[in-house]
C-alpha cells in the first residue's frame, strides 16, 4: 500500500491498524535542538483520545505515546523520530458479523476490491484510529512552529447538524467536551448527541482550523501551492468530504470588489482569501473549514451485500462516535501544522536570504 506519507522536508509516515498490536509513525526532517518530551505529545493525544466523554466512542485507549528514536536528552537530534502507541482495548468479536459483509458507507467494499483482502476488525487501516499518530507527529510540528516562529494553530467545532455557533471565544474551547467556542451552544450540542444515541444514528459536523502568525511567503507554486497542500492534508482525514480555504464556496455569491482584500500600510483590510494568495501565505491568519460526514457505524439497519454479492442487511456493532467531528478537532490542527511546518522548512531552504524593499504588512 502506497500513500502512507505526507510532506517533503518535514515528512510523516504512519503505520498500523485499528485492532493491530500497535500504531506507529516515523517523522523525518525535524530540525535538531527542539526540546520535546512524550508529555508534549500526550497533551494533544489526550484531546483526541477515545472514551474521554459520553459523547464519543467508549473504546478506552490510553494512547500513551513512546518516543523510540530521534530524541536525546530531551532534544531532537535531527534524525528520524520514531513514535509508537500500543492498542490495548481492541474488541474484535464485535466485528465478526461483518467478516463476509460490507458496511455501507465504509471502506470495506473498496478495500476488498482494491487489495483482494481486508482486515475487517474495526476497519483495519481505514479506521480513524490511525489518526492518533498524525496527532502525535502534528504535536511536534506545533511545538516547533510556536517555539521558533510564534505560529499557533487552533481549531474548534463550529457546527453539528443544524446547530451552528454564533460567536468564537478561544478560551472556551477547552472548557467543554465538544471543543465548542460558544458556551451558549454546548447544551444544544449535548441534547443533539443524546437524541442521536436514542435513535442509534449519527450526524455530520463542521470544523474551523486557524493558523496565526504565519510568515509571509510560504507555498511552492504551481502544483505545491500552500492551499492545495492544506486541502490535500485535510481531505486525507477520515470522513472529511469538503474543504474550504477562506470564504470557500461563499465566493460564488461575492463580487470582485467585495472579495478582494485591500492593502494599506497598516495591513490588509479583510481576509476573504484565508491568508493565502497565489498559493503563497500573505502573513494573515490561515483559515480553513472542513465538513465531516456522519459516520455509517450506526445501529439503524442498512442494505448491503455479502462478499459473494448476495443482498443482506447490516446493523453495525461495536463502539463508535455519534459525531466524528468532535474528536477530529485536534486531528485538523495536526494536519495543518504538518503542512505549515513542511512549507516553512522548504521556504527556508530556498528563500532564506531573499529580501525586498517592500515592508511586510
Curated annotation (Swiss-Prot):
It comes from the Bacteria. It is an enzyme of class 4 (lyase). Reduced FMN (FMNH(2)). GO terms for biological process: amino acid biosynthetic process; aromatic amino acid family biosynthetic process; chorismate biosynthetic process. It catalyses: 5-O-(1-carboxyvinyl)-3-phosphoshikimate = chorismate + phosphate. NADP(+) binds at residues 48, 54. GO terms for cellular component: cytosol. GO terms for molecular function: chorismate synthase activity; FMN binding. InterPro entries: Chorismate_synth (IPR000453), Chorismate_synth_AroC_sf (IPR035904), Chorismate_synthase_CS (IPR020541). Its cofactor is FMNH2. Its EC number is 4.2.3.5. Pathway: Metabolic intermediate biosynthesis; chorismate biosynthesis; chorismate from D-erythrose 4-phosphate and phosphoenolpyruvate: step 7/7. Keywords: Amino-acid biosynthesis, Aromatic amino acid biosynthesis, FAD, Flavoprotein, FMN, Lyase, NADP. FMN binds at residues 125-127, 238-239, 278, 293-297, 319. The keyword Flavoprotein applies. CDD domains: Chorismate_synthase. This reaction introduces a second double bond into the aromatic ring system. Belongs to the chorismate synthase family. Homotetramer. HAMAP family: Chorismate_synth (MF_00300). This is Chorismate synthase. It comes from Vibrio parahaemolyticus serotype O3:K6 (strain RIMD 2210633). The lineage of its organism: Bacteria, Pseudomonadati, Pseudomonadota, Gammaproteobacteria, Vibrionales.
Amino acid at each position: 500500500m502506497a500513500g502512507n506519507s505526507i510532506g517533503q522536508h518535514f515528512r510523516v509516515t504512519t503505520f498500523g491498524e485499528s485492532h493491530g498490536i500497535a500504531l506507529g509513525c516515523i517523522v523525518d526532517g525535524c530540525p535538531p535542538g527542539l526540546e520535546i518530551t512524550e508529555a508534549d505529545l500526550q497533551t494533544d493525544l489526550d484531546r483526541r483520545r477515545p472514551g474521554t466523554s459520553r459523547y464519543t466512542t467508549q473504546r478506552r485507549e490510553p494512547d500513551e505515546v513512546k518516543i523510540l528514536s530521534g530524541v536525546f536528552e530531551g532534544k531532537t537530534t535531527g534524525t528520524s523520530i520514531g513514535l509508537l502507541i500500543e492498542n490495548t482495548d481492541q474488541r474484535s468479536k464485535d466485528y465478526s458479523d461483518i467478516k463476509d459483509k460490507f458496511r455501507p458507507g465504509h471502506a470495506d467494499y473498496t478495500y476488498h476490491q482494491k487489495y483482494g483482502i481486508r482486515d475487517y476488525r474495526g476497519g483495519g487501516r481505514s479506521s480513524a484510529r490511525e489518526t492518533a499518530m498524525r496527532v502525535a507527529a502534528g504535536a511536534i510540528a506545533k511545538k516547533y512552529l510556536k517555539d521558533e516562529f510564534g505560529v499557533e494553530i487552533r481549531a474548534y467545532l463550529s457546527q453539528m447538524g443544524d446547530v451552528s455557533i454564533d460567536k468564537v471565544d478561544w478560551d472556551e474551547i477547552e472548557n467543554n467536551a465538544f471543543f465548542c467556542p460558544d458556551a451558549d451552544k454546548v447544551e444544544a450540542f449535548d441534547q443533539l448527541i443524546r437524541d442521536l444515541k436514542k435513535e442509534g444514528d449519527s450526524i455530520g459536523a463542521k470544523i474551523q482550523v486557524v493558523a496565526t502568525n504565519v510568515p509571509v511567503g510560504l507555498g511552492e507554486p504551481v502544483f505545491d501551492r500552500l492551499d492545495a497542500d492544506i486541502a490535500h492534508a485535510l481531505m486525507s482525514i477520515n470522513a472529511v468530504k469538503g474543504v474550504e480555504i477562506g470564504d470557500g464556496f461563499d465566493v460564488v455569491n461575492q463580487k470582485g470588489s467585495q472579495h478582494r482584500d485591500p492593502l494599506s500600510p497598516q495591513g490588509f483590510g479583510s481576509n476573504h482569501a484565508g491568508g493565502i494568495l497565489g498559493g503563497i501565505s500573505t502573513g494573515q491568519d490561515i483559515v480553513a473549514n472542513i465538513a465531516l460526514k456522519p459516520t455509517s457505524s450506526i445501529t439503524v439497519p442498512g442494505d448491503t451485500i455479502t462478499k459473494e454479492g448476495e443482498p443482506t442487511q447490516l446493523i453495525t456493532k461495536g463502539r463508535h462516535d455519534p459525531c466524528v467531528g468532535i474528536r477530529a478537532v485536534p486531528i485538523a490542527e495536526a494536519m495543518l501544522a504538518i503542512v505549515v511546518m513542511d512549507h516553512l522548512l522548504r521556504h527556508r531552504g530556498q528563500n532564506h536570504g531573499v529580501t525586498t524593499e517592500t515592508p511586510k504588512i
